[in-house]
Amino acid sequence: MNLKDYIATIENYPKEGITFRDISPLMADGNAYSYAVREIVQYATDKKIDMIVGPEARGFIVGCPVAFELGIGFAPVRKPGKLPREVIFADYEKEYGVDTLTMHADAIKPGQRVLIVDDLLATGGTVKATIEMIEKLGGVVAGCAFLVELDELNGREKIGDYDYKVLMHY
């Protein structure tokens, strides 16, 4: 299945000069959505994953069905003020400054093997901050999986030597 058939391209969104890759059509098609989830599940199977971690919001949309299919838990990564219990923080660089992500302080147990799942790898800031928090809690990042990678933004450089899978490259 060619998943790119289910990605909408919107020019100059959210601002002039940006090409936005919208995964909504993929999610709206049951066969394409299931196929994408199964591809990530297959990638995860050999890695003996204990937990899926997904950044808000689209990491939830992709990561939760992967966790469900694997029969394991899911831990959300959110912006500050969105998680109700004790959290840890990690800052990351964005195009116009610094932002912060949080994760529950008890989300990952030491030694747990974690797969980070998100919709898009762009600059890599989000995944780098997520890796930092998982490792701070003693987790082992076994890999990362993305529906889409925007190759020209070089997000792969922020992942370093961690294994990763991408279903579509732009």
Curated annotation (Swiss-Prot):
Keyword field: Cytoplasm, Glycosyltransferase, Purine salvage, Transferase
CDD domains xrefs: PRTases_typeI
Pfam families: Pribosyltran
Record GO terms (molecular function): adenine binding; adenine phosphoribosyltransferase activity; AMP binding
GO biological process annotation, one example: AMP salvage
SUPFAM superfamilies listed in its UniProt record: PRTase-like
The keyword Membrane appears for this protein: no
Compartments, as annotated in UniProt: Cytoplasm
Catalytic activity: AMP + diphosphate = 5-phospho-alpha-D-ribose 1-diphosphate + adenine
Family of the protein in this entry: Belongs to the purine/pyrimidine phosphoribosyltransferase family.
PANTHER family in alphabetical order: ADENINE PHOSPHORIBOSYLTRANSFERASE
Protein's name in the database: Adenine phosphoribosyltransferase
Taxonomic lineage of the native organism: Bacteria, Bacillati, Bacillota, Bacilli, Lactobacillales
